[in-house]
Amino acid sequence: MILVTTTPSVDGYTITNYQGIVFGEVVSGVNMFKDLGAGLRNMFGGRSQGYEEELMRARNEAIAEMQQRAEAMGAHAVVGVDIDYEVLGADNGMLMVTASGTAVQIARTA
């Protein structure tokens, strides 16, 4: 399993090699029923569970894709991870989530 961290280093480990920048991207459509429910909650207040679940799913998929790409590069970890969100489409019906970081090889510090 590839370790993922937002920090520039991993406690207890030394970075031995920088493999390069790695990304994971997910573009997801939001369905009509979630839109309707979110619109009603926007009018009356409250949280949109449908959107929140879609956001979590997309974020987890982007991180998993980034981990797979890092593993293919021979990395043990991804450091300095950043996650970005963007709403796309003429009707703002698409959500793009991008996870990026630096793929590295690490060794346990003595």
UniProtKB/Swiss-Prot annotation:
Protein origin, superkingdom: Bacteria
Gene3D superfamilies linked to this entry: Hypothetical protein apc22750. Chain B
Pfam families: YbjQ_1
Family (UniProt): Belongs to the UPF0145 family.
The name this protein goes by in its record: UPF0145 protein BL0562
